[in-house]
C-alpha cells in the first residue's frame, strides 16, 4: 500500500515535467540563476573548489579584476533567479485566480492546453449560441462569440426602448456560458424579478449590463469589464453597435417589422432585412473572422438568430472569404412560424441567399438520432424533425447523435456532443488538407 502511494506521489511529481505547462523553462532559469550566484560567490571569496575556474578567468581576462567578474556573474545569477521566480509565481497565480477546478497541476495543464487551442468564431444568438459556447470552451480559450442584436422582445426589448442600449439578453447568456463558475453566474444572470414597479420581468443580468453600459459609455466596454470580473474564457462581441431592427417579407408580399413579430404571422418567409439596411460591423468582429481557424454558424433560430448576423454585409463577405474551416450546426426540429417543413437543404439555401454566396460553409452538422416518443410529442405541438436530404446538399454532411439525454423528453442539443462532433470534423479536415500537400 505504501509503495503504491509512493509511486503515485512520484508520478504526480513527474507530471510537472510534462510538455506544454510552460513552467519548466522558469524552473531551469531559477536553477541557472542559483548556479551563477554560487559560482560568482565562490570566485569573489576565493574558495578552493573554483581554483581551476579562476585560473581560466585569469588567462582569458588578464586585465580585468577578478572581483569585478565575480560580481558580474552574481548579478547575472540574481537577475535569472528572480526572473524565473517571478514568472513561476505569475503562471501559478494566473491559474489560481481563474478559480479553475481540480488540483493546481491539472488546472495549469488544462489552461495551457486551452490557450493553444484553435481560434474559433461562433456566430449566432439565442439559446443555441450559449449552448454551443458551453461545449467549445472545453476545447479552447480562443473563442469569439458574435451575437445578433436584433432582439426587441421581453426585458431586452424594454431596455432597448427605454434606455437606448443594445438588447443585452443574448449577450448575457453568452457571458454566463463562458464563465468559469458557470452554474452560479447563470443562476444570478437569469434571475428574473417577479415584483417591483419597473423591475418586474427584468433579469438581473440585463440590468447589470445596462448599468455597466451607462457607466462605461458603450456596450462593448460594458461586456469587456463584466467579462474581466467573471473571468470568462474567450470574449463576447455584438455584431454591430447600430440600432439594428429586423423586418421580414413573406411569400405573399406582406412585410412585418420587429424580430418578435416575425414568427407570429406563420407565413413562409421570402427574405429578411434590417432597418437601417447598411449596418456597420464591429471592427473586432471582422478581425476575429479573418484570424479564425474555425467558424461556426448556429444552432439557433434560423431567421432571428443566425441570419441577422449575415445581413451585415461586411460579416457575410468576410465569412465567405475566410480561410478558416466553416460549419453550420442545423437545428434538430422545425420552428413554428420560421422553418415549418424545412429540410436541411432549405436551411443551407436560406443562409446562402442572405449571404449572397454559396461558398459560405464547408460542412453541415445534423442530428441523426431522435427517439420516437420525443418526435411524437413535438409533432403534436406542430414541430417536425428537420429531415436530411443529402442529395440536395453539396458540402460535407456530418451526421452524429447530438441530442441531450432528457428525462423530461425535451429535444435539446447537447453542448458536449455538438462541440466534440465539430472538433473531430475540424481535425479530420486539417489532416485531409495536409495529405493533399
Language model regions located:
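Electropositive, gly/pro-rich neighborhoods at or near active sites that engage anionic ligands
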Residues: 2-99, 148-266, 423
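A short, basic/flexible loop-to-alpha-helix module at the beginning of a structural domain
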Residues: 102-116, 280-286
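Short glycine/serine/threonine-rich phosphate/pyrophosphate-binding segments
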Residues: 127-133, 155, 304-311
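A short helix->loop->beta-strand "cap" motif at the edges of active sites that frequently abuts
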Residues: 140-141, 322-326
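Active-site gating loop/helix substructures
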Residues: 238, 242-301
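Glycine/threonine-rich flexible loop motifs
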Residues: 302-312, 374-382
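Charged helix-capping and loop-helix junction motifs
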Residues: 309-316, 342-347
